[in-house]
């Protein structure tokens, strides 16, 4: 019940019941504030949602580099493109499935390519089902898994500067049926709230506005600071947050990766790494840590490998790298410096005046005979090593991811390696 008293609000200039004004106590007396409760709420809301002045644009809108080896040749299918720039890329942790940058999914069934059927969850989020390679009770097996389309499109096509917090996805125009990668923005909870509020009020969700929100300190998580963005490792890598355990195995792996790519002294000793680089997402340690912990497995020592899944690859990224047992990784390593003037695995024996084929495994040398030409010696080395790699893959079958097993079974040694 009201008191029967009224007052005009200084903000909206409307006469309202005195009960709609907060009370302020001053010098032992009570006064009614001259701005009504509703207007005060709107003022606080506007201040909370307003962008800061002079925002430093440290994070820019970027898209992932797609390796051509991952792109499906659509001529192998009866499926047509919906737009000129549509591509389907292999999801390396799933069985026989390809994702489009427009959010369409192709599955391979009995040597036939078909478009996957979609459904919606209770929140209206588009999804489909696939079989994901999963480490369970000491072995890898394909388990039925849900693919949320927008989330997967972002994961495969869009650079996410902060995977730890950016778990919300803004669809341009608030249209959840639009999963084109250039219309999806990974945001944290507060950033998503700001973009949504601004769009509902103004109809504006331009990239310029969203990038400002992404960079505004007001809407960053508590662990973020400008200092955490400073590239302190090899002039490229930044920690992405406070409280990082610099003694952890994952941090050391991250540092080693950056040194391989950007340390001139390391390149002087290992010139084969001179053209290598780290993808945009992994320059942030927090992002690398999320991937590493999700893919770590088993008790055996694992190496971070960039070459097995895609031969000749020079980019360290979630889409091109895997963790492989050390003995497997050492078999695949290509060292031009160690090879010398002859093909890989071939040495000239001055005493016998012949070419010797030799395979080094685990610190031991396996002699494969002597030959009149380096080509003959290499042919023997090639056959033996390919068979050896396949035998090793069979020994590790179910103990290593399917993508790694498949790569090993199809690995070819070339004279140009």
Q: What are these model-derived regions, one by one?
A:
Residues 3-4, 31:
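Flanking scaffold residues of small Cys/His-coordinated metal-binding clusters
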Residues 7-9, 357:
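A short beta-strand micro-motif
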Residues 9-12, 36:
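Short cysteine-rich clusters marking metal-coordination/redox-active sites
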Residues 18-166, 175-302, 313-382, 386, ...:
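Conserved recognition-core residues within compact binding domains
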Residues 388-417:
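Extended, polar beta-sheet/loop recognition surfaces of beta-rich domains
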